[in-house]
Amino acid sequence: MRRGLLCGCLFLMPALCLMSGCGEKAEQEEKNSIRLGVSIYRWEDAFVSTLRAELEEKAKEYEQETGLKVVLDIVDAKESQSVQNGQVERFISLGCDALCINIVDRSAASDIIVRAMDADVPVVFFNREPVEEDMDRWDRLYYVGADAKESAVIQGTILADAYDA
């Protein structure tokens, strides 16, 4: 359930941005495709690997529902922030309409944000939330994922309940 909701949000956010014109270039009147750049911090992560497969499935569903072709460029950052920064540069140079980033280092999002702002490309960070100061820098940055504090409280409650039992 959580993966499906996360995938749906990840896919829907850039699509809505594009349809509302926030990712549109001035010279483009009508788009017949959406190009999304997706950088995943590490392929081997079981959850993220499942998420990748579901993103591809959601892209196919979206194409069938809207007739709009979805080009997904999904890459592995290999747990390297510098590799991920290079991937973002490449996505922007390819003309991606939106970026979906599973950030390697949540405290190093500023470089990605600056590049996206300069190119006017919205960014959806997922599963790992950048620091609040970075997220507040621009109104076209989004985060999809769990609230870490809330998750910790729930986990603590489960442990306490198990201990009391």
Indicate where each model-derived feature is located.
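Bacterial N-terminal signal peptides that target proteins for export
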Residues: 1-9
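C-terminal motif of bacterial Sec signal peptides marking the signal peptidase cleavage site
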Residues: 17-21
